[in-house]
Amino acid sequence: MKTLYDDWDTWQRLMSMLEYQFGSNCEIILHDLTKDYNHTIVDIRNGHITDRNIGDCGSNLGLEVLRGTVQEGDRYNYVVYTRDGKILRSSTMFIKNDEGNVIGCLCINLDITETVRFEEFLKRYNSYEIEEDNAQSILPTSKKHAEANTVPSDSSSNPPSDSEVFANNITEVLEFLIAQADKRAGKPVDELSREEKIEFVRYLDQKGAFLVTKSSERICEHLKVSRFTLYNYLDLIRKESNTNTETNKEE
């Protein structure tokens, strides 16, 4: 397979199967990552879940894969909190061509917001005290398994720093990455030293921010540095990265 369209009928049938199997609370998206990243969605079912349509952009995780920061980008059964308060149970599978290059990805976002709330309700409703001798008769067989499958109930909490963000255009994704870099820095841009600004740029580079068209202009504006200075930072970062790669190979 060279492109997604070489097997387009199969992808369409697979998406239809998933759509009918999981119903309207499950969003299924097919991305063509050979396109402009601002318009990667080539098919989407139940797009109301993340408010996206055909022609919208991919998430920040796809940028990391294209940048090469993440070698094996497949992720299964992880939790994402959307900006409008939804809790999603998500999986992402990247699609490669015959040469092993990433050309697309298939994503599933199952809205579990209401079931998580119902789970919390049941915990409160079933609150009780039991004698230790009778504990085995009512507690789960594997407490560890039950705890491992518990999803945090506070959908208003801030997403973790490596969270996935769903957006209608790539500018929103870039702004999200800049905001995450700000959080990591922990201080206003005006107070950042040269070394801290380099780390700021290093983070954005690892996240694939510079794959976004005209991202350099926005990042220069945010850091209050010239384009010349920004490119000097990038040159330094990538030289260090290449040196580390060569050292690891020798070892």
Describe each region flagged by the PLM.
Residues 215-223:
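Short alpha-helical "recognition helix" segments of helix-turn-helix
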